[in-house]
Amino acid sequence: MFILGSFTEEDVREYDLFNANNTREDWELAGETSEYNCMAYAFGAFEWMVPYSYWSGDEKIEEMAKEINLKKKKHIEALRKALYYGDYDHPFAMKLAITRMLKRFKGLRKIKSLKELQKGEYGIAYACGGGDFHFGTYIDGSWSHKMGSLDAEEVECEDDVFGDCYDSRRVYFAMKFSEVGKINFD
């Protein structure tokens, strides 16, 4: 599993995260695998990805609070509780996830609506709810997504991506096709 706050260049090379070395078979690339989830699908990767992993003990709450400029003890405690209980749609948890995505993925920018997409970009929508997060992609007027270990699928509309479960506010991003697979390690 790749945690946005902690994976390294060596991890990307070793696991061939973006299939740069063509280590995966065609059937794996078609989305018929449990090897990657919705986040990986949205960003063109082929290993499970999560925005953070507080519950695993891999990350420290103080460091995560710094990433989103939380200084008050009550705010840091609110973040800790949200992450511990898997409250992905808590405002601080969403801010942490969004901050990490924008920092890690080259060519990614936050937008207010898909109307802001420019030539050479595709849309990504992010929402949370029910103790989970989900991503959908918007390319040339079509929506698609990948639920956990299930196959990727094209759906009729954005609401079909998220259903009733992912009921947080939706956050939209524009991703440059030419930058897929390029990661910031600063």
Role assignments for model-derived ranges:
Residues E10-R13, N22, Y36-C38, F43, ...:
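Alpha-helical structural elements
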Residues E59-D151:
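...with weaker cross-activation on analogous glycine-rich loops/strands in unrelated enzymes
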Residues M1-E32, Y36:
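N-terminal intrinsically disordered, low-complexity, charge/repeat-rich segments that act as generic
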Residues E14, D26, A40, P51-S53, ...:
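Intrinsically disordered, low-complexity N-terminal regions enriched in serine/proline/glycine
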Residues A30-G57, H75, H90-K95, D132-F135:
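Active-site nucleophilic cysteine motif
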Residues V12, F46-W48, K60, G131, ...:
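Short linear sequence elements within intrinsically disordered, low-complexity coil regions
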Residues F2, F7, F18, F43-F46, ...:
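Phenylalanine-focused residue identity feature
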Residues I139-D186:
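Active-site or metal-binding loop neighborhoods of secreted/extracellular toxin and effector enzymes
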